[in-house]
């Protein structure tokens, strides 16, 4: 599995960058925001999400871990694929997107190409509670994703996350949350 690339940017287009790593050129799907920060001929370090489908092997690249986490979460929403997730990241920074979800600005979300009212509403419902407002947000988001990958729904996870002690390690928080969810 490819989780990162460090190499020289050979070519940049709106949603793709070609990165040369020791003689091999990788085509990496990127948001327009990421593409704007890359420079041809310069060294780049991208966090990679590798998606293997029946008909394609895709690499998605991110400069920031927060973008990658948001992208992975968006892909879990039924009706959101890589193209729409990249369109969201092209339109909003993770912080801007978090504010849109927190303030329930469905109309702003509908401005993203490929997102209509129905999908915007679905994204809002699925992501309410994903962004937790406290100093432990990155750890809480990881706990949320871990519990979700185990099959729990956000409606079950969110109340449990609020009861967790604030300074638990990610592993301890997952264990405690699982105990609460299974009781």
UniProtKB/Swiss-Prot annotation:
Residue ranges of the region described as Domain III: 139-183
Region (Flexible linker), start-end ranges: 139
Molecular function in Gene Ontology: ATP binding; four-way junction DNA binding; four-way junction helicase activity
Region (Domain I): 1-63
Subcellular location(s) of the protein: Cytoplasm
Start and end residues of each stretch annotated as Domain II: 64-139
InterPro entries from the UniProt entry: DNA_helicase_Holl-junc_RuvA_I, Hlx-hairpin-Hlx_DNA-bd_motif, NA-bd_OB-fold, RuvA, RuvA_2-like, RuvA_C, RuvA_C_sf
The entry's keywords: Cytoplasm, DNA damage, DNA recombination, DNA repair, DNA-binding
Gene Ontology biological-process entries: DNA recombination; DNA repair
GO CC field: cytoplasm; Holliday junction helicase complex; Holliday junction resolvase complex
Role noted for this protein: The RuvA-RuvB-RuvC complex processes Holliday junction (HJ) DNA during genetic recombination and DNA repair, while the RuvA-RuvB complex plays an important role in the rescue of blocked DNA replication forks via replication fork reversal (RFR). RuvA specifically binds to HJ cruciform DNA, conferring on it an open structure. The RuvB hexamer acts as an ATP-dependent pump, pulling dsDNA into and through the RuvAB complex. HJ branch migration allows RuvC to scan DNA until it finds its consensus sequence, where it cleaves and resolves the cruciform DNA.
Comment on protein domains: Has three domains with a flexible linker between the domains II and III and assumes an 'L' shape. Domain III is highly mobile and contacts RuvB.
NCBIfam families hit by this protein: ruvA
Subunit structure: Homotetramer. Forms an RuvA(8)-RuvB(12)-Holliday junction (HJ) complex. HJ DNA is sandwiched between 2 RuvA tetramers; dsDNA enters through RuvA and exits via RuvB. An RuvB hexamer assembles on each DNA strand where it exits the tetramer. Each RuvB hexamer is contacted by two RuvA subunits (via domain III) on 2 adjacent RuvB subunits; this complex drives branch migration. In the full resolvosome a probable DNA-RuvA(4)-RuvB(12)-RuvC(2) complex forms which resolves the HJ.
Family stated for the protein in its record: Belongs to the RuvA family.
Name listed for the protein in its UniProt record: Holliday junction branch migration complex subunit RuvA
Gene designation: ruvA
């Amino acid at each position: 599995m490819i989780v990162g690339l460090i190499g020289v940017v050979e070519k940049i287009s709106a949603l793709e960058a070609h990165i040369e790593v020791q003689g091999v050129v990788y085509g990496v799907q990127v948001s327009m925001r990421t593409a704007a920060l890359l420079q041809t001929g310069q060294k780049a370090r991208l966090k990679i999400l590798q998606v293997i489908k029946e008909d394609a092997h895709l690499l998605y690249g991110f400069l920031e871990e927060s973008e990658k986490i948001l992208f992975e979460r968006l892909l879990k929403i039924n009706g959101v694929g890589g193209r729409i997730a990249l369109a969201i990241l092209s339109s909003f920074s993770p912080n801007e997107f978090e504010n849109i979800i927190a303030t329930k600005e469905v109309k702003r979300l509908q401005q993203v190409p490929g997102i209509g009212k129905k999908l915007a509403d679905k994204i809002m419902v699925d992501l309410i509670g994903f962004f937790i407002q406290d100093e432990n947000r990155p750890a809480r988001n990881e706990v949320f994703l871990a519990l979700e990958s185990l099959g729990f729904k956000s409606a079950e996870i969110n109340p449990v996350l609020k009861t967790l002690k604030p300074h638990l390690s990610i592993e301890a928080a997952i264990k405690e949350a699982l105990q609460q969810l299974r009781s």
